[in-house]
Amino acid sequence: GHRADMAIFPEPSNFRIYPTIKGELYFKLTVPGKSTHICNRHLVAQPLPHGVERPGVSAIDNMLKYQLAILELEKQWNLWRSNEHVPPGGMFININTMQAGTSLTSVPDSAEATGSLLFNPDLTAAEVENEIRATLDRVTQSDYWLREHPPVLDLPLDSASTAPWVKEPVNLAHDHPAVGVIRGAHQKVTGHTPEVTISPFVCDANFWFPLGQPCLVYGVGDPSWGIHGANEYLPVADLIQATKPFAAVTMDWCGVAS
């Protein structure tokens, strides 16, 4: 399709310039168990005599093993995978939803967790996926029952569309000409020089940049203003004020006919 010299995504950066954006992946982990009545809990969690078949296995107990491994991986990432643009603790894994069991009187036979992760811009989605899979596989191999009944990891997790939702990082050079033009235009109109830094969020720019489209984020609003929540808002005065630097950027980048 058509390509532009530059694409500006007017996400709520509060007029900061974001040429760098972390990558993002979503996942779903389904961990099996074996259902039995709760009166058999002692036969689920404790050693059994030789020859006695274990009547049940708690999927929640098994899920906890994987969750702890994920938390440890997150810790190791932030200890050893630093990046010049990412603040400490900026590479993380978040468990967003958990569901397990169907009865108050049974050991759960399945547990499901979904989550998302943001990763440093110097990594690729494939590298991160491989590390996640290796981490979870070590848990599986350490448990006799799970070796025979491994979990199912959907990574990357399919979005509402037909394609897996993979957001690769954006790594536009901070000295790219567009950054200078936006800084200059903003300073000319407002009297303030905007900060050039890494975005705290991902956006549609993550889909465009891997396709060869130079892009960055620069816009009005702030994530603290109810974004993705109740009473999301943008002051009208700020919206009107935003038109001025955008007009200046357009004229300075594209030029004005004489």
Show where each model-derived region lies.
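Metal-dependent amide/peptide-bond hydrolase catalytic core
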Residues: 32-258
